[in-house]
From Swiss-Prot:
It comes from Staphylococcus aureus (strain Mu3 / ATCC 700698). GO terms for molecular function: D-alanyl carrier activity. The modification O-(pantetheine 4'-phosphoryl)serine is found at residue 36. Carrier protein involved in the D-alanylation of lipoteichoic acid (LTA). The loading of thioester-linked D-alanine onto DltC is catalyzed by D-alanine--D-alanyl carrier protein ligase DltA. The DltC-carried D-alanyl group is further transferred to cell membrane phosphatidylglycerol (PG) by forming an ester bond, probably catalyzed by DltD. D-alanylation of LTA plays an important role in modulating the properties of the cell wall in Gram-positive bacteria, influencing the net charge of the cell wall. InterPro entries: ACP-like_sf, DltC, PP-bd_ACP. It is found in: Cytoplasm. GO terms for cellular component: cytoplasm. Residues 1-78 form the Carrier domain. Keywords: Cell wall biogenesis/degradation, Cytoplasm, Phosphopantetheine, Phosphoprotein. The keyword Transmembrane helix does not apply. This is D-alanyl carrier protein. One of its GO terms (biological process) is symbiont-mediated evasion of recognition by host antimicrobial peptide. The lineage of its organism: Bacteria, Bacillati, Bacillota, Bacilli, Bacillales.
Length: 78
């Protein structure tokens, strides 16, 4: 499975919503797809399943606003 697909699957799992895979440009926070509690869960899952550590200090809601932006940010960190 390619990295992008792994990230989108993980995001869909945390969000409990496949819209993140169907529309990777959806504004996940603005649309209420992911809340702050799920954000913490997402960061933990990224660390556990992708072995990429993202501290809450490195997390910027604007830079992580869409699934596509999350994939890009994680590609830079891996």
């Amino acid at each position: 499975m390619e990295f992008r697909e792994q990230v989108l699957n993980l995001l869909a799992e945390v969000a409990e919503n496949d819209i993140v895979k169907e529309n990777p440009d959806v504004e996940i926070f603005e649309e209420g797809i992911i809340d702050s509690f799920q954000t913490v869960g997402l960061l933990l899952e990224i660390q556990n399943k992708l072995d990429i550590e993202v501290s809450i200090m490195d997390f910027d809601r604007d830079e992580w606003a869409t699934p596509n932006k999350i994939v890009e940010a994680l590609e830079e960190l891996r």
